[in-house]
Amino acid sequence: MAKIYHDLEVSLEVLSDKVITIIGYGSQGRAHALNLKDSGMKVIVAVRPNGESWKRALEEGMTVEKIEDAVQKSDIIMFLIPDTEQPAIYKEKVLPYLRPNQALGFAHGFNIHFSQIVPPPFVDVFMVAPKGPGPLVRDLYVEGKGVPALFAVYQDYTQKCRDIALAYAKGIGATRAGVLETTFKEETETDLFGEQVVLCGGVTALIKAGFETLVEAGYQPEVAYYECLHEMKLIVDLINQGGISFMRKAISDTAKYGDVTRGPRIVNEETKKEMKKILNEIQNGQFAKEWILENQVGRPVFNALLKKDEDHLIEKVGKVIREMMPWLKPKK
């Protein structure tokens, strides 16, 4: 079993004389910056001058600087902007100002693992990846709790990088829940696999296929929406709360029997073969190359596929159904 680190096992001392720059002030960036500041750390928020993030960070009492200025004043530089934006920012506004013994931090391993960012040998490189969205990271911290996280060390120039990563995790509240050690390779490949095969790609494809099957068989789209999409949350919440066996204790015997006898006919050995193929595409860098190229040429395939799904009947029906449920309206 993996080793899990908690509050009492981790010291903030290694960060006591450090200045931490957070690049970005979005969902994760804001949470990390505020939590670290409240943990007594010296924090600089580095964002585009006079943009919305700049103004918000100032309003919330943060020290705000241009990225290149912040890098020169910092000991730790944490990248909390989208993966696709990081390489250019690193090349133009971070790399020219790096000095020995600084540390580069990431919340996802993609750019390091796939060599989109190649750090010089004289810096530390680590990752702290909370397993929850930024607002939850902040809210639980304020409540005296925390969101679990993964941490990893890629390059340990100072021989203190592991301590720095753990202290950073404690600073954002993660050790209150527990942090698990991994590698950049493991985090990147499993994260991409989970997104593509289960959490995003797998789930949305399954929902659409089920919805289409019922509608094509003559059932009302509204009823198909309820059965194939709306009720998904009820089941996933139970699984999230206590696991698959816990969920099965909460459903009818009829549903349970259908689950264990029909489910394996949908996700079968052929499905697993395709899963293994997708995993191999992640491991050998094929997916990364494809996604990087897609961004370089303006995302034509990506945008077309998104548009196709946005025009799907399930979206039109869902909009009508959700009007009946005002409590589901997204918070702005």
From Swiss-Prot:
Alphabetized UniProt keyword annotations: Amino-acid biosynthesis, Branched-chain amino acid biosynthesis, Magnesium, Metal-binding, NADP, Oxidoreductase
Domain of life: Bacteria
Annotated metabolic or biological route of this protein: Amino-acid biosynthesis; L-isoleucine biosynthesis; L-isoleucine from 2-oxobutanoate: step 2/4; Amino-acid biosynthesis; L-valine biosynthesis; L-valine from pyruvate: step 2/4
Keyword tRNA-binding in annotation: no
Domain (KARI C-terminal knotted): residue spans on this chain: 183-328
GO molecular function, one term: ketol-acid reductoisomerase activity
Cofactor entry: Mg(2+)
Cofactor note: Binds 2 magnesium ions per subunit.
A GO cellular component annotation in the UniProt record: cytosol
Binding site for Mg(2+) 2: 191, 227, 231
Active site: 108
Reaction it catalyzes: (2R)-2,3-dihydroxy-3-methylbutanoate + NADP(+) = (2S)-2-acetolactate + NADPH + H(+); (2R,3R)-2,3-dihydroxy-3-methylpentanoate + NADP(+) = (S)-2-ethyl-2-hydroxy-3-oxobutanoate + NADPH + H(+)
PROSITE patterns: KARI_C (PS51851), KARI_N (PS51850)
Binding site residues for Mg(2+) 1: 191, 195
Gene3D superfamilies referenced in this protein's UniProt entry, alphabetically: 6.10.240.10, NAD(P)-binding Rossmann-like Domain (3.40.50.720)
Residues bound to NADP(+): 25-28, 48, 53, 83-86, 134
Purpose of the protein: Involved in the biosynthesis of branched-chain amino acids (BCAA). Catalyzes an alkyl-migration followed by a ketol-acid reduction of (S)-2-acetolactate (S2AL) to yield (R)-2,3-dihydroxy-isovalerate. In the isomerase reaction, S2AL is rearranged via a Mg-dependent methyl migration to produce 3-hydroxy-3-methyl-2-ketobutyrate (HMKB). In the reductase reaction, this 2-ketoacid undergoes a metal-dependent reduction by NADPH to yield (R)-2,3-dihydroxy-isovalerate.
Protein name, as recorded: Ketol-acid reductoisomerase (NADP(+))
